């Protein structure tokens, strides 16, 4: 009984060494890192996806790729990646973002979040999981339909 995996968000950016120690103590299968991202073009750095912290209230100086590299060194396996700009909008998934993550970090089992609007979005994703909150709530499709796609695609990610 109990939780088999925990999700860690802002702590991974604010106290990366603490989270690295958690990986050492509990192992890679017990931890999922939340990578809530927003596009940024800071004056001093290059444009890209940056990790947001504090419930999406502030952008950190850490790029998504840097975040994944740092924790990849300790065996990062599970990531929940939310494109904040699309969360709750039902405007479609940022498949380009998720494909870039999967291509650059193939060992990661990625869960996508933000923008799901249709069954077509589920078909287009090649992630290991997806958050379908608002689309399901608004009745864009049924849970059975979404699960059928998941069952059919199982093992293809």
Where are these regions (language model features)?
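Catalytic cores of alpha/beta
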Residues: 1-2, 17, 21, 96-130
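Conserved anion-binding
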Residues: 3-86
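Glycine-rich beta-strand-to-loop/alpha-helix junction loops that act as flexible
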Residues: 8-11, 82, 87, 109-117, ...
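C-terminal helical cap(s) of enzyme catalytic domains, especially alpha/beta-barrels
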Residues: 19-26, 123-157
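Short, basic, helix/turn surface patches
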Residues: 30-41, 105-116, 133, 157
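Conserved, mostly hydrophobic/aromatic
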Residues: 33, 79, 101, 125, ...
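Leloir-type glycosyltransferase catalytic cores
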Residues: 89-91
């Amino acid at each position: 009984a109990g939780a088999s995996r925990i999700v860690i968000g802002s702590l991974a950016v604010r106290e990366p060494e603490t989270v690295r120690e958690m990986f050492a103590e509990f192992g890679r299968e017990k931890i999922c890192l939340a990578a809530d991202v927003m596009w940024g073009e800071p004056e001093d750095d290059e444009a890209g996806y940056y990790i947001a912290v504090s419930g999406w209230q502030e952008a950190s100086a850490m790029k998504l790729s840097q975040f994944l590299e740092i924790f990849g060194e300790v065996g990062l396996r599970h990531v929940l990646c939310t494109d904040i700009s699309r969360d709750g909008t039902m405007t479609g998934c940022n498949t380009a973002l998720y494909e870039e993550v999967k291509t650059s970090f193939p060992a990661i089992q990625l869960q996508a979040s933000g923008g799901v609007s249709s069954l077509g979005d589920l078909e287009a994703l090649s992630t290991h999981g997806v958050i379908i909150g608002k689309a399901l709530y608004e009745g864009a499709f049924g849970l059975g339909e979404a699960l059928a796609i998941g069952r059919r695609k199982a093992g293809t990610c």
